[in-house]
Every structure is written in C-alpha cells, then in structure tokens.
Amino acid sequence: MSTPAADGFRMPAEWTPHERTWMAWPGPNPTFDHPDDLAESCRAWADVARAIRRFEPVTVVCGPGRSAEARDLLGPGIDTVERDLDDAWMRDIGPTFLTDGKGGLAAVDWTFNGWGAQSWARWEHDAKIAAYVGDLAGAKTYASKLVNEGGAIHVDGEGTVLLTETVQLGAERNPGWTREQVETEIHAHLGTSKAIWLPRGLTGDYPPHGFGTLGHVDIVAAFARPGVVVAHHQPDPAHPDHEVSKEVIGLLKAATDAHGRRIEVVEVPAPTVLEADGHWADYSYINHYLCNGGVVLCGFDDPRDETAAGIFRRLFPERTVTLVDARTIFSGGGGIHCITQQQPKN
C-alpha cells in the first residue's frame, strides 16, 4: 500500500497560501451542555470565522438542520454544508491536507478516538469527518491507523514536525506503538524526516482540568518559519506551567531541525490570569491561526494581549494581526487553532 510521502505528498507549512479554511459548527453535546454555553460558543466560533473570511474563503460543517442558525451568525460570504457531528474541533477531526507541488491534493484521515477515549467525548460521527471533508475538497485520502489529531502536530514545511510524548505515545491513543513506529508513520504521512519531541503539554490540558486533549503541541509551540518556533512562556512561578514551559523552551533551544539548523525560540508570555473555570488556565497565544495575509490571534481581555500581538506583528510584518476573544473557546478545551483547518492551495 502506498503512502503519501512515497507518492510525493507532504504537509506544507501553515504560512503557505490557502485555498480555504474549514471549520465545524458547535451543537448540543457534553462540551456545550447548557443552552447558554452553546449559544455563547456559536457566537465565538462565528467571530473566528468572520475574522478569517477577511482573508480567505471559509466553509463550516454544520450538524443536520443547524446551517440556517449558523448562517445567521456567520453572515454573508461563508459557506455551510451539513453532516452529522459530535463536536466542533475541526483541527482534530478534519483531514490533514497535503500537496505534491504538481497540483495534486491529498488528505490524511488519522484514526480518531475522542482525544484518547476520554469519558466526556463522543466520536462516532467525528471519526468520519476527515474523509468527508477530504472528499468535498477533491483530495486523495490516505487512512492511517495511528490515533492522532491535527492539533498534535506542527510542521515547518521543510521536513520537521513537533510532537508531544503524552499524545502519540500515550496508552490512551496508541498502546503498543514504539517511538520509532510512530515516527515512521508520521513521516510517511506528512513527508517529514525529523521529529522534535516535547515531553508534555500545558497543565490545563489534562484531567481533572475540564476538557482537554492530553497534551496537544499547538498550544505549547508552533513554527513561525523554518528554524524559528514560538513557545508558550509562563512567567509566574505560582502556575505549574512555569516549570512546564521552562522545560519545553530548554528542549527546543537544544534541538535542531531536519536541515541541522539550531532552533531559534521566540518566547510568548502567557496571559496574566492564572485560573479559569475553577482550574489552572491554559490560556495561550501560541494557539493562533495563519491565513492568507492574516494572523488570527487568541485574545483574553488581558494586559498581555497587545504584548503578544506585537510579537506576532514583528514575526509576520506582511500580515494583519487580528485579536479575537477566545475565552469561550478555551472553556470548551481549545483555542482558535483548534477550531480551524487549512486547505492549502494546490
């Protein structure tokens, strides 16, 4: 059986041109278990979609009968389609898109099991969304037996991928898989050749701190360009992520990429708030989304919002940085990057 890499496909970096962005619309489920929570979440998702639509097309997958409500909040110019959904995190349930540099488009359909079969998760329908979206996009779909999500990987487009040990190597997702087997599967499906492993994610991403993914990398570290990584920095020693971020930053600074370059780390300070919803806050500016000509950045009505925006403006001077309040999204277990999935131009 062929693999994407063997067929000439690779995952391009997020900063390369996009054809469109895919999202999923919130519906009644354990994540949004009260009508007020659901209504607030729909407004938050719509705010993100509208911010992205300024820069590129957006398609939102809605549960049956929910597209009319979605369009009312989304406004004009955003497409909707209907399909059975369990949740609304398109980064994780959607496909990982690949290109071959010759006009071809492919999609990886990772195995999805509700972020490690967590007690609150439902995934009967979400496990089928990647293949559905890939088909709508006209992509050649490759299925992988690896339990993985889009928020658990971040690539530089030049052969390097960021991973976390508690996700791909966790018994909740891939019992019996060795590190070497995981790397082989990842490289075969992303076209990468070097993995940089981080030990874990942020504290709030694990039980008992509400809804979490057990350590997704896209809230901790992300490539800004080849050889340069933005990393979450918690400056307050009262927060357990002070030690977590110090360890992650140290590992990144000691790492090299697929081309042997030493990683340059740009530290982005966490918002000042330490707790949210009765748990340690995992608010992070790292969970941003790059779209054509824009950076959609998580905002928290926090004094450090503008500090973070300034860092991203310096990193991406050719892009418009837009802050969108992400506190409601984070209360459900993720951020702006978690609810978006880019389809690259092919």
UniProtKB/Swiss-Prot annotation:
One of its GO terms (molecular function) is agmatine deiminase activity. It catalyses: agmatine + H2O = N-carbamoylputrescine + NH4(+). Belongs to the agmatine deiminase family. Its EC number is 3.5.3.12. One of its GO terms (biological process) is putrescine biosynthetic process. Pfam families: PAD_porph (PF04371). The gene is aguA. InterPro entries: Agmatine_deiminase (IPR017754), Peptidyl-Arg-deiminase_porph (IPR007466). The keyword Membrane does not apply. The active site is at residue 338. The keyword ATP-binding does not apply. It comes from Streptomyces avermitilis (strain ATCC 31267 / DSM 46492 / JCM 5070 / NBRC 14893 / NCIMB 12804 / NRRL 8165 / MA-4680). Keywords: Hydrolase. This is Putative agmatine deiminase. It is an enzyme of class 3 (hydrolase).
